[in-house]
């Protein structure tokens, strides 16, 4: 079982900076404004050959009436419950506050391995300022700088010293599935439904999710990483820097995933921004599954065909995409959509032998040849698949620059149909032979 280490503390003490420092890249958004991290953010670290899971939590507050602060507190408690080790991060530049005592009291009750981590010693080098934290009664104390890394090596050495060296994390080829869409279409609710618990904060306020959150899903014979992302708005509707970073992180999550589940709000329909997100996924050559969410509002199977046909007309010519009409409340077709996304991931990696490709595709092209141009007969000699991550095929012809777009789509559709590339963008190239 993978060991779990969580970073906790009041707002703006450097938790996300330390999280990014340990996992080795900027997965959490870092800003001087407090309250940026809301959900539990998961990352993975390999230190001295030992792997563990790291959780970044939102800044804990105990008296705020703000709805997000209350939800952050819930996420804080969830993180404590699932952790083996707790890093209590403090900032020596401020006096000890009542909230610090509250956090200390809560974590000490758990009887787990606790580290008091005094941050920002690159700025506040007076070691005597750290003695005030003896009041917490936490014996394992480390002074670090999450900005420049001072002291983090000793901290990590101590953390992993009691871990089993044989612990392993995710398989390297496990499918990564990004849950994407406009704000407030039900992305986090979908993940919480799959997990049967409140992993991510859900409210009726758009923009609740800011970081992209990785979640390991292993149920019903399915194993994959689900990535909950911030809602992607149009650029003109982005009102603050944090939201801009969140949208950029969401787009990055699409690029780093195998398949994207694009969630559409059934009530508002397939809007222009949904088309923009669809194009982002397609242009990055990622697999696509469409989820028409909140279908329980309609609960009308007679509408499905007309709704689906309308969407396929909008997304044409790439409309060979699985479409599911789902509801996070009734759980209709949710598992089926995840299974389809996983299947698409493995089909993305499919490599077709050149002999088989030519045996199946060339007879179709010979039966349906490209129209002649200015009396010139266009012939395709043979084809092969390029060794890239996403499916790309190269066709050798006597006039590569004269191939019409419609014929290119004809080839693409036949490859998709014959070799089960449903939901996968295919790139077709032509070269002179």
Curated annotation (Swiss-Prot):
Alphabetic keyword roster: GTP-binding, Nucleotide-binding, Repeat, Ribosome biogenesis
Transmembrane segments: none
Keyword rRNA-binding: no
Sample GO molecular function, one term: GTP binding
Domain KH-like: 350-433
Limits of the EngA-type G domain: 3-167, 175-349
List of residues binding GTP 1: 9-16, 56-60, 119-122
Cross-referenced SUPFAM superfamilies: P-loop containing nucleoside triphosphate hydrolases (SSF52540)
Amino acids binding GTP 2: 181-188, 228-232, 293-296
InterPro entries: G_ENGA (IPR031166), GTP-bd (IPR006073), GTPase_Der (IPR016484), KH_dom-like (IPR032859), KH_dom-like_a/b (IPR015946), P-loop_NTPase (IPR027417), Small_GTP-bd (IPR005225)
Subunit structure: Associates with the 50S ribosomal subunit.
Family: Belongs to the TRAFAC class TrmE-Era-EngA-EngB-Septin-like GTPase superfamily. EngA (Der) GTPase family.
Record's protein name: GTPase Der
């Amino acid at each position: 079982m993978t060991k779990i280490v969580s970073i906790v503390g009041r707002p703006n003490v450097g938790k996300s900076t330390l999280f990014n420092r340990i996992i080795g890249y900027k997965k959490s958004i870092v800003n001087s404004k407090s309250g940026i991290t809301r959900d539990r953010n998961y990352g993975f670290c390999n230190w001295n050959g030992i792997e563990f899971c790291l959780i970044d939590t939102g800044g804990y507050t105990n008296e705020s009436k703000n709805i997000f602060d209350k939800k952050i507190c819930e996420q804080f408690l969830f993180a404590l419950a699932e952790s083996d080790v707790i890093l209590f991060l403090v900032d020596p530049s401020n006096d000890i506050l009542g909230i610090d005592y509250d956090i200390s009291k809560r974590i000490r009750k758990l009887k787990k391995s606790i580290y008091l981590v005094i941050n920002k010693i690159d700025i506040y080098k007076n070691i005597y300022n750290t003695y005030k934290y003896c009041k917490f009664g936490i014996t394992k104390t480390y002074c670090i700088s999450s900005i420049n890394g001072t002291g983090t090596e000793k901290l990590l050495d101590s953390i992993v010293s009691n871990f089993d060296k044989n612990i392993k994390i995710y398989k390297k080829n496990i499918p990564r599935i990004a849950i994407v869409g406009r704000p407030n279409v039900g992305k986090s609710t979908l993940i919480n439904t799959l997990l049967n618990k409140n992993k991510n904060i859900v409210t009726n306020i758009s923009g609740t999710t800011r970081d992209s959150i990785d979640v390991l899903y292993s149920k019903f014979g399915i194993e994959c990483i689900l990535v909950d992302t911030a809602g992607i708005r149009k650029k003109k509707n982005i009102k603050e820097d944090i939201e801009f970073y969140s949208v950029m992180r969401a787009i990055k999550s699409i690029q780093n995933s195998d398949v994207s589940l694009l969630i559409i709000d059934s009530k508002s329909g397939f809007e222009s921004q949904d088309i923009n997100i669809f194009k982002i996924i397609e242009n990055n050559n990622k697999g696509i599954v469409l989820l028409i969410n909140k279908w329980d509002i309609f609960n009308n199977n007679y509408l499905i065909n007309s709704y689906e046909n309308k969407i396929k007309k909008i997304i044409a010519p790439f409309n060979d995409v699985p479409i599911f009409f789902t509801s996070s409340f009734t759980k209709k077709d949710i598992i089926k959509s995840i299974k389809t996304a996983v299947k698409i991931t493995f089909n993305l990696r499919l490599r077709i032998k050149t002999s088989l490709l030519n045996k199946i595709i060339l007879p179709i092209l010979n039966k349906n040849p490209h129209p002649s141009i200015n009396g010139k007969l266009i012939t395709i000699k043979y084809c092969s698949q390029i060794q890239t991550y996403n499916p790309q095929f190269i066709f050798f012809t006597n006039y590569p620059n004269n191939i019409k777009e419609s014929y290119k789509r004809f080839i693409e559709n036949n490859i998709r149909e014959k070799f089960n590339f449903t939901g996968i963008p295919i790139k077709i190239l032509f070269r002179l032979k």
